[in-house]
A protein has these predicted regions:
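Glycan-recognition and catalytic cores of secretory/periplasmic carbohydrate-active enzymes
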Residues: 1-198
Length: 198
């Protein structure tokens, strides 16, 4: 597709059309996007009162890139306003430096809990912090700082080793300062992302 300018332009037009169709998700009091939208019979938001950090955090790269490709800053402005609540959290305190909760209020942009970790529903937020820095290291230096803070806290507070296998590391979940010994495939992301950021 890339060598064919007409096809690239057609894909870009479709991406703009899709983003324009979904952009009303950000029409909330805080600018945090509503995670559930209905397009038929007419566009409307769900009754959701919060969004999760992964749902919010994964939009930032694609919508910022769309603004860069189209020269229309409106897409980047929408997602970066929402992302600002994740970068500079308020509400429920961080359980550990850089490690935020899961739910963010659509009304205020404040965190509603201090529960999280590197599982489904949370890990993508952290993943996109370092991806944004790699995308533009000048504009998104703060994202890298946030990533390093979260990674360092993860190593210090969430890393766990079985008594019988000190060479194996598991990452714990947290609810405030209380740690929970659960693990899953998403935890592998930290290892790969830590390698990328070093």
């Amino acid at each position: 597709v890339a060598p064919d300018a007409a096809k690239v332009e057609s894909l870009l037009e479709q991406a703009k059309s899709l983003a324009d169709s979904l952009s009303f998700a950000f029409d909330t009091p805080s600018g945090v996007p509503n995670p559930t939208l209905f397009l038929n019979p007419e566009p409307r938001q769900s009754d959701e009162t919060q969004n999760g950090i992964a749902g919010m955090g994964t939009l930032v790269l694609e919508w910022t890139r769309l603004s860069d490709l189209t020269g229309d800053d409106k897409y980047a402005q929408l997602v970066q306003k929402a992302e600002s609540y994740l970068i500079n959290p308020t509400g429920s305190p961080e359980a550990f430096p850089g490690l935020v909760g899961e739910g963010v209020s659509l009304e205020t942009g404040e965190f509603l809990d201090s529960r999280g970790g590197w599982g489904g529903g949370t890990d993508s937020f952290y993943e996109y912090l370092i991806k944004m820095y790699l995308y533009d290291s000048v504009a998104f230096e703060e994202y890298k700082e946030r990533w390093v803070l979260a990674a360092d806290s993860t190593i210090e507070h969430l890393a766990s080793h079985p008594n019988s296998r000190g060479d194996i590391t598991f990452l714990l979940q947290f609810d405030g300062s209380e740690l929970h010994p659960t693990s899953g495939h998403c935890k592998l992301l930290l290892c790969s992302m830590r390698h990328i950021s070093s």
